[in-house]
From Swiss-Prot:
Pfam entry (one): Pex24p
Organism: Gallus gallus
Family: Belongs to the TECPR1 family.
Compartment(s) of residence: Cytoplasmic vesicle, Autophagosome membrane; Lysosome membrane
Record protein name field: Tectonin beta-propeller repeat-containing protein 1
TECPR repeat residue numbers: 210-239, 254-285, 301-332, 344-376, 739-766, 962-991, 1007-1037, 1053-1083, 1095-1135
GO cellular component term, pick one: autophagosome membrane
Biased composition, class Polar residues, residue ranges: 413-430, 486-495
Hydrolase as UniProt keyword: no
GO biological process: autophagosome maturation; autophagy
Domain comment as written in the entry: The PH domain mediates the binding to phosphatidylinositol-3-phosphate (PtdIns(3)P).
UniProt keyword annotations, A-Z: Autophagy, Cytoplasmic vesicle, Lipid-binding, Lysosome, Membrane, Repeat
Domain of life: Eukaryota
Domain PH span(s) in chain numbering: 618-727
Amino acid sequence: MSSSLLWAVDIFGRVYTLSTVGQYWELCKDTQLEFKRVSAVKQCCWGIACDHQVYTYVFSGDVPIRYQEETYENQRWNPVGGFCEKLMPSDRWQWSDVSGLKHQQLDSFTLPSPHWEWESDWYVDENIGGEPTEKGGWTYAIDFPSTYTKDKKWNSCVRRRRWIRYRRYKSRDVWAKITSHDDPERLPDPFNDISIGGWEITDEPLGRLSVWAVSLQGRVWYRENVCHHNPEGSTWSLISTPGEVAQISCGSYDLLWATLWEGQAIVREGIDRNNPQGISWSTVESPSSDNGIMHVSVGVDVVWCITKDRKVWFRRGVNSHNPCGTSWIEMVGEMMMVNVGLNNQVWGIGCDDRTIYFRQGVTPSELSGKMWKAIVCGRESDRSQTGSSTSLLSAGCFFTDDIQNQTNTVIQGDADTSSDTELSSIPTNLSSTPPMGAAASSASSTGSQAAGAPASVTVDPLDSDQGEAPAASASDEKAHLESRKSTNPTPSTELQWTNIDLKEAHRHAVLSVSTFTETSSLSSLGMFSVGAEEQYGADEHPLWAWVSGGGCLVDLHSPLKWFAVPSGLSSSVQSLSLSITPAQTAAWRKQIFQQLSERTKRELENFRHYEQAVEQSVWVKTGMLQWWRNWKPHKWMDVRVALEQFTGSDGMRDSILFIYYMYHEEKKYIHVFLNEVTIIAEVLKEGKHSFALYTPERTKQRWPICLAATTEQEMHDWLSLLTMSCCESRRIQGPPSHHAIWSVSCKGDIFVSEPSPELEAEPHPMPCDQMFWRQVGGHLRLVECNNRGIVWGIGYDHTVWVYTGGYGGGFIQGLASSADNIYTQSDVKCVYIYENQRWNPVTGYSSRGLPTDRYMWSDASGLQECTKANTKPPSPQWSWVSDWYIDFSTSGGTDREGWQYAADFPASYHGHKTMKDFVRRRRWARKCKIVTNGPWLEVPPVTLWDISIIPSSDADDEESVALWAISDKGDVLCRLGVTQQNPAGTSWLHVGTDQPFVSISVGAFFQVWAVARDGSAFYRGSVSPKKPAGDCWYHIPSPQKQKLKQVSVGRTSVFVLDKNGNLWYRQGITPSYPQGSAWDHVSNNIRKMSVGPLDQVWVIADKVQGSHGLSCGTVCHRTGVQPMEPKGLAWDYGIGGGWEHVTVRGNASQAPRGTVPSESPPEPMESEGRVMC
């Protein structure tokens, strides 16, 4: 589970955060302000301070928040002076925006607030549509406005160039005051409540948020233009309401509720991506006629409220179509306030004890949950103040009496010397508020005595009554220690201490077991300074005033650490233990494992000369499955399957799979030797729990053996057994090697193959259809690796994962999977369907099409009917996590309602309607989620689109490895601190660009190439281990009339892939001129490609001929790649179709030397280097 934060404010106005993977409340870094309320999302938090002003807290990150300012310089040609600044009266401004209608001089741009700073000065953009311009950046046209080109022609009468400048948001990890530039007469009065949400309404612009606020006069305000590139927003807009509003709550989508001072609730209707402020209000009455609503909180499709008698209510029937819901249901408990966060999870603050409670059991099927459970986490300051004391206490419990007695005198002496320590003053402003909840049970006898504490006292570490701490001299304290010893005369009841790791030994003394178990007071464990800013007692829990979970993602599959308190230990020391470092633990476990391994070998060697009692053993597993038969008509038929395993005299275990079927009432069978199977993979076929077995021959035919089980568990049992049998037959065990080739199927399944040295041998390389692929647990969209064993992956939701060195996971369990380094992994992706309509002169666009038209609800091709009701998740492992929504990010653009228009089906679609458009479509999306496990750990917090690791490196294990990436926003990043011991690295280094990028690759000698979103190519200069980010970008012209989408760099070769599936090779690359000179076409029908450390080329190809038709998504290997023939000669076809990604960047194993050349060169598999269609 990735880390996210729960925000809370205590009664003193201090802001705390609690991580979903932590156990302690951490005080906000910026503690200069006191707050009343906060509202948080993942990327930021907004709050109202005690001065009633609005502040925002933006998290720091490796990727800066940058905004690009641009203006255009326009010139016209005249016969006297040529191009000059003098324009015609009808022309646009000399300095203008892109349309020419707005006057924009360079000095007219100012920073929007003190929280921004300029990143650089103005400079000219020398790029137009992915093509570099001449020096100076001018583009030419006949007149304003027109189509501009980079080439100057005889009729070019006007020209313009683009100036750009970046500003950077600098106030991160601090509370930044929201300044207003509005008319002073319309400035909002002081604020009383604030709520942020709406991030799921639209993703345009990126990171858009809806910020709603309530003023002291009961007016509602909306903050305009809050997004990722403008975290402060621009202006406040007043929203009219039917009454005076007391409090407001905004959900992640289109749900907005507010409470009136009269006790009713009002609901905002008409909120959508085109109108985020909504249209009108509807009124909802209070669930109780006697007590009105005082607080409300909304989620995606839930509403919770608190009435004035502190009762908790849940609103039934709330959704986007009915935001008002249907009825109220009373919940158990009394709360001051509640807050609904991500996934509709609920938090509340108890009415009596001011403790934060978490609503357990909230699921998509049970939105109201089951029970309230208190969060019992302590504060981070408590852990830091008692770290050494607690480690001593924990350590003392594990040592024998001899060791304890040896240190007894030392501890007593240290206790005497610690008596001179004085503590700071203890605040007395909590005297009227006794401890509540869990704190009350442990300190009920002491809480009320804190009021009499003087301003400067000396606290006795052995006194369980922490409130009684009279000032005393050193002699008085010694006497008090002796008196405490006399009250505990029994040695057996004394918990002795040890002097191991004594960082603050002088602060500790002998403590009785009875005293320790009966008190949770931190002062009973040792002295510590209570700072002047400390508002609570030593072990008192904070008293909370507000909580916000809008940025807290609670994973239902991962338990939280917020509730566990070990018995017998105080809450302040619950997570502290022996001061044994992880390195010591790892060395200890490694030593034990080594000793056990040596003993096993020693015992076996003494008996190897004995004769085997059984020379051969046979084991058979049978079952009933379905088989997709080979002959027409192809359909599923019931078969009996038997897996026979036998062990020969040489100890080798082999297996045969028999499939028995009936053909014309005659019993027949087919058999497969598992040592010939090249891959076993789960496939999607007609909604069955099916999997496929490939052999080299069936790989060539593109026609595997497909079997289906009745249940998912039965399918996984067979997959696990067959995979383990194949690995045993080939003597493959353990994690993949550093030279392994990784690939990902279109389902997101991860496979790995151990390359043979003959794979790149010339002139007779090993055919890649004979490669054996085994599955690795997890779910990813792409994987990248190098020859140092560093492997990174990116999921469909752009989450980044790093390989832990394990193997197995997923359905592969038991002996075929490693016990360590397997972790829970999740992924989210979208399922798309299309709504199609045709125009007719009577009703306009409607769902009534022609008989020859596609289905009115279909997939992208239109050949398969896909409605909202019958569309299922990709497999039973997936579950829906959202409802259907219109996708406005479809390629080609959409109108305000998401429609795309075309002349007919199928055709090229565009986002605006013309007179010739008789059909239209729009895409609907729904998110689904899979939870599995595998040898992967998440690398937070940046989400990525592409990644590249230097394919080979001669550096030491401790030296850093070059790793470059593209974020999902298009930022270029360089990872620092990546080593073989720490493959996850330490931090990101942002590399500035003038536009978003989509692909990047780093070669074996630190050559960094990238592709921008507009299809242009760039080369990064001066990249080296001492200068990992390089110095500048060089614009490389793309192949003529082609837009690039991927680049891959090997040792000396650079290949790119354009959006039409053409593969290109960069010619003329030399150490003195690394940019190269020209592009040379290699092949077509390519989907993805990867260039290895030896310049070997592997691709995912489409339209590969098989025995039953064309296959898409086939792994192919380029043969004949030599220094004198870097483009290679032909394609060798491997596993597929249905593959999405392959990487060969870890395979640095050289082919064996001394091969005898054949008399004639092998005939290429295709002409002109093209994949066969």
